[in-house]
Amino acid sequence: MIKEVILMTNVEERIEQIIQVLREQVVQDTAVPRNIRRAAEQAIEALMNKEKEPAVRAADAIAILEEISEDPNMPLHTRTIIWEVLGALEQIK
């Protein structure tokens, strides 16, 4: 029982870290096109939806971010961040 609570905390902490990265390095970066920032905001909203299980929230965010990950207008540094976030989200079960 305690182990499950610790695991949930770790998952929630990871989700919070991912949200922070998306906010600070994508949403607030004015060099990133608006449509990409908007998609990052949608992914953040999906991750913050506490009504769903963490794995479902992660899957929702993955779907949103994968859709924009190949956008030709995305700056290279942003693409790298998105790929790192996708890798972190894929580890959430």
From Swiss-Prot:
User: Where in this chain does the entry annotate a coiled-coil region?
Assistant: none
Q: Tell me the leader sequence span.
A: none
InterPro entries in UniProt? Ta0600-like_sf (IPR023130), UPF0147 (IPR005354)
Source taxon at top rank = Archaea
Q: Which family does it belong to?
A: Belongs to the UPF0147 family.
Q: Known NCBIfam families for this protein?
A: PRK04330.1
The name under which this protein is listed is UPF0147 protein PH1921.2
Q: Which organism is the protein's source?
A: Pyrococcus horikoshii (strain ATCC 700860 / DSM 12428 / JCM 9974 / NBRC 100139 / OT-3)
